[in-house]
Amino acid sequence: MRKKKVKIVVDSDVLIHFAKGGVLSFLPNIFPDYQYIILSIVYDEVQTLHTQLDNQIKFLKNIMLEDFAPTDGMLLEFAKLKNSFGEGESACMAYCKFNQDVVGSSNLKDIKEYCNVNHITYVTTLDFLYYAFKRNIFTAQECNKIIQDIRTHGSKLPDITIEKYICTVEL
């Protein structure tokens, strides 16, 4: 029997998206039964968000910074992934492969195939927003504004409304 997935390992793009949407502080509320992990290597990638993240880590119980110190198989997997992908994505995928946790990333070009082949669950920014809408954290109008704000601030995200988005992830 597989162990229950209890951690969401968040990559920099999701953190950046939620910051650009002005709703970073809401991210840990979307899946409150999960521990949100920001690996140190990802934290280093988002230096402009350190103050916001530090405040969340200090005051919220379900978000934490974790030192990325892979050993043995995880270290080899990370090194292999790093040849093709960014350090943050590589760290998140290697960590989740060896811990059976969930990757939080919208960089589908990099993570989708690897996660599917290795049976790693992943959630994207739109998946997070979908669940925020379904759980009444945000209204449809708020979700659609967040999506547009993220796009307006230069991040890649599909031009879609939350009502038309089809989420395939069950958490």
Model regions: which residues?
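PIN/NYN-family metal-dependent endoribonuclease catalytic core
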Residues: 5-10, 18-20, 25-70, 126-130
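Short beta-strand scaffold positions
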Residues: 10, 105-106
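Alpha-helix capping/helix-boundary segments
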Residues: 14-15, 42-43, 92, 110-111
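Short, hydrophobic beta-strand segments that form beta-sheet elements in well-ordered domains
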Residues: 36-38, 102-105
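Acidic catalytic patch
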Residues: 63-83
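Acidic, metal-associated active-site segment
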Residues: 86-102, 110, 131, 149
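Acidic, PIN/NYN-like endoribonuclease modules and their adjacent C-terminal/linker elements
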Residues: 111-171
